[in-house]
Amino acid sequence: MARVTTQFTGIIMYRQDYRERDLLVKMLTDKIGPAMFFVKNAKKRGFRMTADILPFTHGTYIGSLDENGLSFINTASDTSQYKKIASDISKNAYVTYILALVDSAFNDGRSIGGWFKQVAAALDLIEKGLDEQIITNVIETQLLVAFGVAPVWDRCVVCGRNDLALDFSEQYGGMLCQNHWSLDEHRLYLDRKTAYYLQQFATINLQKLNSIRINPATKRRLQQVLDTLYDNEVGLNLKAKRFIKQMNKWEQNIGKLSMND
């Protein structure tokens, strides 16, 4: 597709300096997925779209979209920033990671189908106060397919049964029912609750989610499973993920200090 001026919906992912007065702004769009935009004079005092291109801003834009090169923004309307995400270190970290995952999973300039609405819904829910780790875990679970990993969550990969206890096997690429656990002594040894939530995460439409509460122990196990899959099967080493791990260590250390006091 040649460059064409059109209206589109976008989410500002990040931006970086370019020359003295200009910016490169990475945006997730509903038309061509992730795309890099050149914004001339964006650092100049009095620039009219300053608020429209702040990180974690979303809204309607008009510009020239290019599938194979830099795109351009002409104007913006009905934009607003996710203020709680922008100001809260934990929400900020998880949303930064979500956007980095999406940026890694999909090529620039290509439509990502329903993923735009799913990511937008994730950010809306985090902004509203739903657990940012759990919302991120849903995105992580569903994005595995985009990275070429397609775990079978809903049934035993050997016999197809789903009425028995299930556990995940990296070797077999999915769940094993208890009749076949002996096939993989290195399976993940999931408890029923963790297995259940992973099955739900794989298919849930975040646009229809209103609330979700999961106890801390199960949250830790869910994260351990997804970290294992991303480390071993996907092989990503994102800066945003490293920051989240470091942030969680800070929280654990603060908790220990509070207990000692």
From Swiss-Prot:
InterPro entries: ARFGAP/RecO, DNA_rep/recomb_RecO_N, NA-bd_OB-fold, RecO, RecO_C
Pfam families in UniProt: RecO_C (PF02565), RecO_N (PF11967)
Gene3D superfamilies found in the cross-reference section: Nucleic acid-binding proteins, Recombination protein O, C-terminal domain
Sorted UniProt keywords: DNA damage, DNA recombination, DNA repair
GO biological process: DNA recombination; double-strand break repair
GO cellular component terms given for this protein: bacterial nucleoid
Family under the similarity heading: Belongs to the RecO family.
Function: Involved in DNA repair and RecF pathway recombination.
Name recorded for this polypeptide: DNA repair protein RecO
